[in-house]
């Protein structure tokens, strides 16, 4: 059984890593980022729900009189 030649693995892994790094740097550098990020104000809108204005009583089974 022939032995696996691993002498070129270091060069292959190193060149692949460098190539991926360069490609990612190019991809990031070509991306358009906003120049001045600003804070967006969040306005909460109060909605009038019909059940908020009414008083409701919830009867739990334990508070009912015994029969």
Curated annotation (Swiss-Prot):
A Pfam family found in this protein is ATP-synt_8
Which GO molecular function terms does the record list?
proton transmembrane transporter activity
Q: Where in the cell is it found?
A: Mitochondrion membrane
Indicate where the modification N6-succinyllysine is found in the sequence. 54
The stretch of residues making up the signal peptide is none
Keywords recorded for this protein, A-Z: Acetylation, ATP synthesis, CF(0), Hydrogen ion transport, Ion transport, Membrane, Mitochondrion, Transmembrane, Transmembrane helix, Transport
Gene Ontology CC: one annotated term: mitochondrial membrane
For whether the record's keyword set contains Membrane, the answer is yes
Listed transmembrane segments:
8-24
In the record, N6-acetyllysine modifications are located at: 54, 57
Task: Give the family this protein belongs to, as stated in its UniProt record.
Answer: Belongs to the ATPase protein 8 family.
Q: What does this protein do?
A: Mitochondrial membrane ATP synthase (F(1)F(0) ATP synthase or Complex V) produces ATP from ADP in the presence of a proton gradient across the membrane which is generated by electron transport complexes of the respiratory chain. F-type ATPases consist of two structural domains, F(1) - containing the extramembraneous catalytic core and F(0) - containing the membrane proton channel, linked together by a central stalk and a peripheral stalk. During catalysis, ATP synthesis in the catalytic domain of F(1) is coupled via a rotary mechanism of the central stalk subunits to proton translocation.
Instruction: Provide the protein name.
Output: ATP synthase protein 8
The scientific name of the source species is Microtus pennsylvanicus (Meadow vole)
Its lineage reads: Eukaryota, Metazoa, Chordata, Craniata, Vertebrata
């Amino acid at each position: 059984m022939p032995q696996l030649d691993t002498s070129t693995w270091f060069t292959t892994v190193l060149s692949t890593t460098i190539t991926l790094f360069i490609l990612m740097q190019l991809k990031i550098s070509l991306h358009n980022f906003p120049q001045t990020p600003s804070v967006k104000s969040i306005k909460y809108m109060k909605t009038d729900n019909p059940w908020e204005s009414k008083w409701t009583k919830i009867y739990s089974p334990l508070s009912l009189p015994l029969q």
